[in-house]
């Protein structure tokens, strides 16, 4: 009777021990050139000022994110209208999305 419960328990332990852990995924981080990020910020502010018909000084850029092949800058106007500027991997402006 004890043997009937022992074998399934051992089989379960062996099978669990055979599974491989999932591989650790690491994001690639590349240091962005400060001059490039400042140029991208200025271009983003310029495009947002044109879109929202206001001055660049009334535009705040609050976040800068890097993805595999692109960059995004998030910001808002003095009226709290949110937007996202998208750039390609070389830092060229792609588009501005209103949120």
UniProtKB/Swiss-Prot annotation:
Any one Pfam family here would be YsaB
Q: Does this entry carry the keyword Membrane?
A: yes
Q: Which organism is it from?
A: Escherichia coli (strain UTI89 / UPEC)
Q: What's in the GO CC field? A: plasma membrane
The protein's topology relative to the membrane is: Lipid-anchor
Lipid modification (N-palmitoyl cysteine), residues: 18
Q: Where in the cell is it found?
A: Cell membrane
Q: Origin, by domain of life?
A: Bacteria
Its signal peptide is 1-17
> What name appears for this protein in its UniProt entry?
Uncharacterized lipoprotein YsaB
Query: What InterPro entries does the database record attribute to this sequence?
Result: YsaB-like
Q: Which UniProt keywords apply?
A: Cell membrane, Lipoprotein, Membrane, Palmitate, Signal
Lipidation sites (S-diacylglycerol cysteine):
18
């Amino acid at each position: 009777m004890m043997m009937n419960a022992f074998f399934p328990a051992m089989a379960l332990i062996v099978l669990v021990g055979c599974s491989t852990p999932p591989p650790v995924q690491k994001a690639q981080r590349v240091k962005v050139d400060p001059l490039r990020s400042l140029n991208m910020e200025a271009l983003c502010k310029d495009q947002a000022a044109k879109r929202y018909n206001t001055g660049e000084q009334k535009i705040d850029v609050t976040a800068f994110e890097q993805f595999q092949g692109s960059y995004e800058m998030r910001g808002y106007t003095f009226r709290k209208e949110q937007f996202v500027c998208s750039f390609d991997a070389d830092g060229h402006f792609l588009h501005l999305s209103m949120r």
